[in-house]
Structure formats: C-alpha cells, structure tokens
Amino acid sequence: MMKKLVIEIFGWYGTVAIVSAYALNSFSVIQANTLIYQILNGTGAIGIVIVSFYKKAYQPGVLNTIWTIIAAIAIMKMFI
C-alpha cells in the first residue's frame, strides 16, 4: 500500500512539474533555456516514467524517458 502511494505521488509530481514548466514558459515567466525549466521538465518526466512503468503503461513511459534524456542533455549543455 505504501509503495503504491509513493509511486502515485511521483506520478502526480511529474504531471504538475511538466505542466508548470510549460505554463510558466508559455506565459513568459521563465525561458526554455533556463535551469529551472529543464529541472522541472526532467524531474517531472522521471516521475511520469516511474508511475507509467509501474502501471505497465509503456507509451508514456518511453516518451518521458526520452523527455528526461533531452532535459539532461540541455542541463549538461548549460554547464559546458
């Protein structure tokens, strides 16, 4: 029971983080090339990956794995 709750929390965090990043960028509060934007996208995608694979929903799991990789590359480029 506790494991399922924790996984659901990861999933909801992921949803809120990705939607927040998109909304903040769309309303010009943050730019897409900022660290906070990429962190929200990357950590949000990780949360969705966790809940997706737990529920055996592989399409969103694969999509968000790719999303995580893109965010990680963008973050690395900021520091190179």
Regions from the language model: what does each represent?
Residues 29-42:
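Structural signature of hydrophobic alpha-helical transmembrane segments
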